[in-house]
Amino acid sequence: MLDFCASQPLTLGVELELMIVNRHDYNLTRGSDDLLRLIGREDHGFDIKPEITQGMIEIGTAIHTRTRAMLEELDAIRAVLVRAADTLNLGLAGGGAHPFQHWSEQRIYPKERYLLVSELYGYLAQQFTVYGQHIHIGCPDGDQAIRLAHFLARYIPHFIALSAASPYYQGVDTLFQSSRLTSVNAFPLSGTLPCVTDWAGFNDYFVRMQQLGIVASMKDFYWDVRPKPEYGTVEIRVCDTPLDLLTPVLLAAYAQMLARECMESGWQAIHSDNYLAYSYNRFQACRFGFEGLILNPADNGQVSLQQDLVTTLTRLEPQAAALGCEAERQQLLARALARDNPSRQLRTLYERSGSLNDLVRRQSAVWMRDAATL
């Protein structure tokens, strides 16, 4: 039985998974232990922890009501990380996947849960050396969380296109805007929330999955959007880790605007038909980004992802005004109109330099030093 811990509606938090690279050829390096040990000597009070393999580290923000404060906290967390990384001659970088690392060289971080995941999923755990941003949105109760999770599913392609930052993987151009999510797809408990309509229905589903021995906790679900009952949030999990500090905040603002629209609007029926085109739309966003096509099963309509995002952002103007994030809405709108995302920036840079090593060096400079945008 899962209890949903109520939280203040529309509060925000984000988690970012970061690459740890050496400063010789900018390949991944097993630096998380040394980095965490050195950071642990500071009384910083931030949420900084290991991830599933040793070339990764995760940071998380506190709870925020406004994105400006979130950006300030992310900047302070970065300062702690950069001091330690400089001391150890390590680099840190954003992006959804390291462009040329080889999964077989990655080592599982020696934490009980990660070792269990590795034992269960074998090489999939090593291949899970990919980097994402998770966005948490506060909900007052479990019923609202289920409703919001289903509501947000409609807009998942937007988050993918805006954040896409993994065009290169294992040394090749994947032709995808976001290749990271293909690594998630391999897990049997990935995908979408079941079509339950309230918290009681979700509890019944969860208990049954526990009884069957399929899951032990909510962490075993790798869904694109999932309730996080212990936090009192709904969590969006499809975004690649951005290259800079501003983009995570813009994505969080978009989630907050959508969540406010959902909570302010009347109840909308939840039907399995809403998910008929989900996988197709998700693929379009991963493969083509803003140039993808979005299908709407309700009217059999088809529209470009870019136009759908622009229409949605325009509609959200009242929500942005109420939340004090009109500047963020305008920046998102400008990016959508320009079809500008990290994958496009990464490809442009690689076309100029022809070096994936140099690409990661530039990614690290952007994240660690606020270097000029790629």
UniProtKB/Swiss-Prot annotation:
Residue ranges crossing the lipid bilayer per the database entry: none
One Pfam family hit: GCS2
GO molecular function terms attached to this record: ATP binding; glutamate-cysteine ligase activity
Keywords attached to this entry: ATP-binding, Ligase, Nucleotide-binding
Gene3D superfamilies associated with the record: 3.30.590.20
Top-level division of the source organism's lineage: Bacteria
NCBIfam families, per the entry: gshA_cyan_rel, PRK13516.1
Record-given protein name: Putative glutamate--cysteine ligase 2
Organism: Laribacter hongkongensis (strain HLHK9)
